[in-house]
Amino acid sequence: MESNQSNNGGSGNAALNRGGRYVPPHLRGGDGGAAAAASAGGDDRRGGAGGGGYRRGGGNSGGGGGGGYDRGYNDNRDDRDNRGGSGGYGRDRNYEDRGYNGGGGGGGNRGYNNNRGGGGGGYNRQDRGDGGSSNFSRGGYNNRDEGSDNRGSGRSYNNDRRDNGGDGQNTRWNNLDAPPSRGTSKWENRGARDERIEQELFSGQLSGINFDKYEEIPVEATGDDVPQPISLFSDLSLHEWIEENIKTAGYDRPTPVQKYSIPALQGGRDLMSCAQTGSGKTAAFLVPLVNAILQDGPDAVHRSVTSSGGRKKQYPSALVLSPTRELSLQIFNESRKFAYRTPITSALLYGGRENYKDQIHKLRLGCHILIATPGRLIDVMDQGLIGMEGCRYLVLDEADRMLDMGFEPQIRQIVECNRMPSKEERITAMFSATFPKEIQLLAQDFLKENYVFLAVGRVGSTSENIMQKIVWVEEDEKRSYLMDLLDATGDSSLTLVFVETKRGASDLAYYLNRQNYEVVTIHGDLKQFEREKHLDLFRTGTAPILVATAVAARGLDIPNVKHVINYDLPSDVDEYVHRIGRTGRVGNVGLATSFFNDKNRNIARELMDLIVEANQELPDWLEGMSGDMRSGGGYRGRGGRGNGQRFGGRDHRYQGGSGNGGGGNGGGGGFGGGGQRSGGGGGFQSGGGGGRQQQQQQRAQPQQDWWS
């Protein structure tokens, strides 16, 4: 192989001092000192104009003419010295197998200023042949920035081929940010495989899904003309790329929430889905969302726009809102899984100063699916970096808490005040483990009138796959009792301990550490990198005990949690449902232990109903306390046993009447009649996970205090 010295085409003095201008050492030619910036050499570190090659990548043999800097590294220098020659021939493994600038021109009219690369050469990514035959248009690779100054004269994407590269390619899908071209707008070329990314995305545990348990879970779907549920993913008309990603992810067959949600969303229906975390609801909205964007193609993508001030505004096709950083990150990683090797890109926005610049940088690379917390999203929209005009799909995850925890004004601002298509023009989906009536009424403001309501039985209640233990523990005995439980569980199992306050989480974790337990904590006062680090230590079992506040742990899907301990019981039984759902995931067996004392009397009756419904052991003292409250009239709960507690909510539209499909909008009862009537609610009911039996059922008038 020729040395870089032989590619110089100029003297060492010329490399060090071009016309009296000092050349920094890191831009010089390495061993010979003269291979960096001589008139014929270019920057041998960057594989630039003329003969210099990227030395570690094999070099550009056969150097061309009059050099200059490939990327200029102007740093306030004059652009005039940055015009290069014709470039070398990109044989052999240039720039780590990517053939960078092989065969292209030199460092054109713009140098490194404003992150613009050289004017010459194509970026023949993954190719081993000649480089692109035409120059970049006003700029080069630009650090993966897909701005309007970076498009070449041609737009073919030579995907992992070993022949000649296409003209001027500079991004993976260089027509995403360009006006649609009839010949290249079908996204026909799938991206190359990347073993490292595959290991990152698909190595997580999915084999632990207990589908036999899932088949026992009851499902109710209400609304007019509810789409038929599916039994297999092959029942859907999915794009072949996402079908392959589903198989690669190890999904054997759809879970109950997926069987009903995916066909409803594919059919253009809005959806309110009541399903517990861990039931597969993230895939239930991501699969139809990614599939729709793929099938719509780039012609339907709202192009990004660069303002006069140089700011680039992205217009996502889909928006997913969630209440916490961790849940947003979890959804983002799942979206990457289903969009793997497709032209679809996801972006992530959540609060915290330490990640802001990185989030904005990645956002500028392109965004079809945006996953965000409401506050950070509003901040970025106020800066003119995000527009909602092209958003055709809206998802609210953990919607009950989003609407109940003070996020409602922010959600309204995002949806109603930023030119987002109206609810009649978009598809909206809401998912949560519970949907009380008041939240349903609030959610209707964002949904079309004919939305589908889906109620999936609690995984861990009706399936009896979570053993629930309620124990009486006085406040001053909690730490001692907790350590007894931890010792009994052992280090081989993951244990999640819930407390009510951030201070309580820190104090308890500190105490357990002093007692030689491997423990970490997450709460709102920790920085984001600390929270992510602690979660990783917990997931991997390095620290098998996690002490968390409920808000910080909202929606987290952590496999293999064997034991959930409610060190502090919540004041709301719905929150109790969210918490115990962290164990017994995807149909597997788990244990939930709750410390109860006089402070928790307000939830005694509802807690008893849940225990009875799940056929769990009911302590005599809890039954007696609940009976005293019921007879004394001192508590207004949600109703007695058997009134649907096995679901996290029932469609309020069909709770107001009884009989066989009575008249009036929403006044009729039952699941009979299908779409043959104007009032009432046609739908499906299944005693198992997604059967197709359509039934007619009479409903008794619910107790008055059911939704109180």
Curated annotation (Swiss-Prot):
Deletion consequences: Embryonic lethal or lethal at the first larval stage of development. Embryos exhibit severe morphological defects. RNAi-mediated knockdown results in embryonic lethality in 88% of animals. Knockdown also results in disrupted P granule organization and assembly in the early embryo. Reduced survival in response to heat and oxidative stress. Double RNAi knockdown with vbh-1 results in a high number of female offspring.
What residue stretch is flagged as signal peptide? none
Residue ranges annotated as motif DEAD box: 397-400
Compositionally skewed regions (Low complexity) per UniProt: 1-21
What are this entry's molecular-function GO terms?
ATP binding; ATP hydrolysis activity; identical protein binding; molecular condensate scaffold activity; mRNA binding; RNA helicase activity; RNA strand annealing activity
Domain-related comment: The N-terminal domain is required for the multimeric binding of laf-1 to RNA.
Biased region (Gly residues) positions are 48-70, 100-123, 630-647, 656-692
Tell me where the sequence motif Q motif sits in this chain: 231-259
Stated role: Multifunctional ATP-dependent RNA helicase. Plays a role in RNA remodeling, but is not required for RNA unwinding. Binds to RNA in a concentration-dependent manner to stimulate annealing between two complementary strands of RNA. This process is also dependent upon ATP; ATP reduces binding to RNA and subsequently diminishes RNA annealing. Involved in many cellular processes, which do not necessarily require its ATPase/helicase catalytic activities. Involved in the regulation of transcription and translation initiation. Involved in innate immunity.
Task: Tell me the subunit arrangement.
Answer: Binds RNA as a monomer at low laf-1 concentrations and as a dimer at high laf-1 concentrations.
Listed A to Z, the keywords are: ATP-binding, Cell membrane, Cell projection, Cytoplasm, Helicase, Hydrolase, Inflammasome, Membrane, Nucleotide-binding, Nucleus, RNA-binding, Transcription, Transcription regulation, Translation regulation
Lineage, top-rank taxon, reads Eukaryota
Q: Which portions of the chain have biased composition (kind: Basic and acidic residues)?
A: 72-83, 90-99
Q: Which family does it belong to?
A: Belongs to the DEAD box helicase family. DDX3/DED1 subfamily.
**Might you give the EC number(s) for this enzyme?**
3.6.4.13
**Helicase C-terminal domain sequence ranges:** 465-626
* Localisation: Cytoplasm; Cytoplasmic granule; Nucleus; Cytoplasm, Stress granule
Q: In which tissues is it expressed?
A: Expressed in the germline and soma of young adult hermaphrodites.
Q: What is this protein called?
A: ATP-dependent RNA helicase laf-1
InterPro entries membership: DEAD/DEAH_box_helicase_dom (IPR011545), Ded1/Dbp1_DEADc (IPR044763), Helicase_ATP-bd (IPR014001), Helicase_C-like (IPR001650), P-loop_NTPase (IPR027417), RNA-helicase_DEAD-box_CS (IPR000629), RNA_helicase_DEAD_Q_motif (IPR014014)
**Source organism per UniProt:** Caenorhabditis elegans
